[in-house]
Amino acid sequence: MTTDTIVAQATAPGRGGVGIIRISGDKATNVAMAVLGHLPKPRYADYCYFKSASGQVIDQGIALFFKGPNSFTGEDVLELQGHGGQIVLDMLIKRVLEVEGIRIAKPGEFSEQAFMNDKLDLTQAEAIADLIDATSEQAAKSALQSLQGEFSKEVHELVDQVTHLRLYVEAAIDFPDEEVDFLSDGKIANALYKIIDKLIAVQASAKQGSIIREGMKVVIAGRPNAGKSSLLNALAGKESAIVTEIAGTTRDVLREHIHLDGMPLHIIDTAGLRDTTDTVEQIGIERAWNEINSADRVLFMVDGTTTTAVDPHDIWPDFINRLPTNLGVTVIRNKADLTGENLEMTEEKGYSVYRISAKTGLGVDELKQHLKSLMGYQSNLEGGFIARRRHLEALEIAASHLQLGKEQLEVYLAGELLAEELRMAQLALSEITGRFTSDDLLGKIFSSFCIGK
């Protein structure tokens, strides 16, 4: 990382009441002397004029100076808070760039400086972007928890436990002549089991955090005229899809993005699945399967007037057998207003079965509660945190290495191989917080930030 002094507009582009220009780096003091004529007292608001090189006033407002390392970035930071007109702000940035050694900041570079100066770790840096991009109150609360270090704390505890166990195992290997067989006395196994249990709990929280950030993709699938589009409309609370009595009305994928008590849900209505010679309908069915294969959950819509079966393997075995392994399925017996079925949820061979009427709305609220529970909804998420897909992947890699290490210990008492699996798990976990992270990954993460962060 360079030690350049950087400048950018910290407030959103456009017209506003206040506009903020942020400068970070060792030449921030030079900017203060050039633009203000003096260096403001650190951490005090200084009302003054912002001047051009010729001494002409560009704007007037508040100047704030933070002496590094006691600043967000860890560098000397100067913030100029003036009027929010874009022309004025552009003039001010142009003036700052006239000072030697100043350049425009790249996206996320202020946060990158903070990361490089150990002011925050990678999950906290990502949480800044997640807090800005939050689309619900719960997402904002969870992002703030991550920014305050809740996720980092969990990961650091895991890393410390894995590191401690690895050192213990390596010590056992280095001193094989000790009377006690460290690998078989149960201490290492118990410590490993506790780490695995802890990791499973963190994975569950991270999965929920990922859903809060990215949402859950739910695909409504089934035969033509089962009521899929009616269910989409009922869940969305508006007429998003055309509904007719003609089978095959929906020929393409329809998407709706809604929030259930702050939990983002991506609902996808698909073409009815059947054998057909209609070219356009065939394309729609192919697209439907593409959506199903990438779904987090499938709502299997069944026309309750056509069958009394509740086991999906009895209703349509070919459909169930074609679904991806481990894809969750909820069976929806629709048209309960016609069949007279009780609006109850039952479990049938591991499948949740709901009776609803998408047309009248009967049972839809219960289905929404079901979807919220699948997303891990809690009425109070003060202790939750935001997680990204890369975090889930790193946790999964760490889990796989710990499981392999468990096998090496239980089956072979292979201390060297256990130590290596622990090392790999440690590296995977450390990548989450950025303790061991490639420059390519850092560049990718920070480039997704807005310019002034």
Swiss-Prot record:
Family: Belongs to the TRAFAC class TrmE-Era-EngA-EngB-Septin-like GTPase superfamily. TrmE GTPase family.
GO cellular component labels: cytoplasm; cytosol
Subcellular location: Cytoplasm
Residues binding Mg(2+): S229, T250
Top-level taxon in the UniProt lineage: Bacteria
UniProt-annotated binding residues for K(+): N225, T244, I246, T249
Lineage of producing organism: Bacteria, Pseudomonadati, Pseudomonadota, Gammaproteobacteria, Alteromonadales
PANTHER family in the record: TRNA MODIFICATION GTPASE GTPBP3 (PTHR42714), TRNA MODIFICATION GTPASE GTPBP3, MITOCHONDRIAL (PTHR42714:SF2)
Primary role: Exhibits a very high intrinsic GTPase hydrolysis rate. Involved in the addition of a carboxymethylaminomethyl (cmnm) group at the wobble position (U34) of certain tRNAs, forming tRNA-cmnm(5)s(2)U34.
Gene: mnmE
Cofactor(s) in the UniProt record: K(+)
Keywords: Cytoplasm, GTP-binding, Hydrolase, Magnesium, Metal-binding, Nucleotide-binding, Potassium, tRNA processing
InterPro entries, per the entry: G_TrmE, GTP-bd, GTP-bd_TrmE_N, GTPase_MnmE, MnmE_dom2, MnmE_helical, P-loop_NTPase, Small_GTP-bd
Residue sites binding GTP per the record: 225-230, 244-250, 269-272, 334-337
Predominant place of localization: cytoplasm
Manner of cofactor binding, per the entry note: Binds 1 potassium ion per subunit.
EC number: 3.6.-.-
Organism: Shewanella oneidensis (strain ATCC 700550 / JCM 31522 / CIP 106686 / LMG 19005 / NCIMB 14063 / MR-1)
Record-annotated TrmE-type G domain positions: 215-376
HAMAP family, alphabetized: GTPase_MnmE
One GO term (biological process): tRNA wobble uridine modification
Positions with a binding annotation for (6S)-5-formyl-5,6,7,8-tetrahydrofolate: R22, E79, K119, K453
Protein name in UniProt: tRNA modification GTPase MnmE
GO function terms (MF aspect): GTP binding; GTPase activity; metal ion binding
Subunit structure, interactors included: Homodimer. Heterotetramer of two MnmE and two MnmG subunits.
